[in-house]
């Protein structure tokens, strides 16, 4: 045998010996595959190390996945019966995967759990994972939208706090515009964002009717919210521009061109880092409600933990979900990522509930509503954005936009109606 093949064989033998040693070290251990996305996938490992230390018979392989492609990858994995044991899930995906039969029903697990207590979770967030009375995911972190605003400009206009009703809110915006520099706007509502018209609509209406078969956007209830939204542009209180047309949101907010903005918890850190001239002159507030005595609601967002039905290690997978759901672990997760916990006890134990910027999120999370729990919801949200933008830019009247929105959503739901009708026929 020549020297080169001999060296290759020796190298292969050494490699196999190393692998054999690893296999021996892990012999008997259950290996869980856990998909986590974005920053969570990058930062969760210290918690996984703690879990493995507490559960020496379980090893967790974290696979970091990009948000931009993971949805398609999950569908491909389901088709190929190669789904992970546990995965982080955007809350709007739960209905789609549940309809495919991809998810394990977690209802019986929670009933027997001492770690996962439904009463400790924000109700609207928990409800995002409940379909047909069964639980398909456990909230991991929460997201919603509230108002970030320049407290000094509102105070100069005569408002020491953000109003709590729509009529007062619009009066406050008019007063703020009077004290802003020329070209200023009391609120920024980028027309390429679906969240503002969606949130306002959730305050007054059910988005779908007849059991989720048809759009409900031309209804008087949704029209009230949509007219309020479009009116902000037509009165010049908000610019009819997209986020991509604004070179630097934080600079414009700092110099007072925009006095308020509906956004999410990630911007607490961004505002703290990027505002220079007016670092002490901003605050947060819940979304105002349509009328007195009707507190404003916002959208229930965030991510949950699911177990796939195809997992061969469901008991161990549930142990991981339970561990990541413990309040003290959620507090550490918040410190690692900045993500907001879904459990009230984690807020209280961490001091987040008293934080001057986060406490408005804490208050708002007690008043959130899920979007329709159907697989088509993401397409519906983008359709709301399309016609919201058309009306905001003056390309369609309110009634034209709502009629077109209903028609498009009805087309999106055509297959759903067919399936529901077939099911009803037996």
Language-model features, listed with the residues they occupy:
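Hinge/lid segment of periplasmic solute-binding proteins
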Residues: 91-146, 170, 199, 281-285, ...
């Amino acid at each position: 045998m020549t020297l080169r093949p001999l060296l290759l064989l020796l190298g292969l033998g050494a490699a196999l010996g190393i692998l054999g040693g690893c296999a021996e070290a892990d012999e008997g251990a259950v290996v869980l595959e856990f998909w986590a996305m974005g920053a969570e996938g990058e930062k969760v490992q210290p918690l996984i190390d703690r879990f493995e230390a507490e559960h020496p018979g379980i090893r967790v392989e974290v696979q970091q996945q990009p948000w931009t492609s993971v949805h398609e990858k999950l569908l491909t994995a389901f088709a190929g019966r190669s789904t992970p044991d546990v995965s982080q899930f955007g809350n709007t995906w739960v209905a789609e995967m549940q309809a495919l039969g991809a998810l394990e029903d977690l209802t019986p697990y929670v009933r027997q759990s001492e770690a996962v207590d439904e009463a400790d979770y924000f109700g609207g967030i928990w409800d995002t994972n409940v379909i047909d009375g069964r639980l398909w995911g456990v909230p991991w972190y929460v997201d919603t939208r509230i108002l970030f605003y320049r407290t000094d400009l509102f105070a100069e206009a005569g408002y020491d706090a953000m109003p709590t009703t729509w009529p007062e809110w619009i009066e406050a915006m008019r007063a703020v515009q009077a004290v802003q520099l020329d070209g200023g706007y009391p609120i920024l509502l980028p027309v390429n964002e679906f969240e503002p018209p969606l949130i306002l609509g959730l305050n007054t209406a059910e988005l779908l009717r007849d059991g989720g078969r048809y759009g409900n956007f031309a209804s008087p209830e949704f029209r009230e919210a949509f007219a309020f939204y479009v009116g902000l542009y037509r009165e010049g209180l908000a610019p009819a521009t997209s986020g991509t047309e604004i070179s630097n949101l934080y600079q414009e907010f700092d110099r007072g061109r925009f006095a308020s903005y509906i956004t999410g918890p990630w911007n607490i850190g961004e505002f703290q880092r990027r505002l220079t001239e007016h670092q002490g002159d901003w605050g947060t507030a819940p979304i105002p409600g349509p009328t007195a005595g009707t507190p404003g609601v916002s959208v229930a967002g965030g991510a949950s933990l699911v177990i796939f039905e195809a997992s061969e290690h469901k008991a161990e997978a549930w142990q991981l979900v339970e561990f990541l759901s413990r309040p003290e672990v959620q507090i550490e997760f918040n410190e690692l990522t900045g993500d907001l916990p879904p459990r009230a006890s984690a807020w209280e134990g961490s001091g987040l509930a008293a934080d001057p910027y986060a406490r408005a999120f804490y208050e708002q999370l007690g008043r959130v509503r899920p979007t329709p729990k159907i697989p088509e919801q993401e397409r519906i949200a983008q359709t709301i954005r399309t016609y919201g933008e058309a009306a905001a830019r003056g390309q369609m009247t309110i009634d034209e936009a709502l009629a077109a929105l209903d028609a498009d959503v009805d087309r999106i739901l055509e297959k759903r109606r067919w399936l529901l009708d077939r099911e009803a026929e037996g």
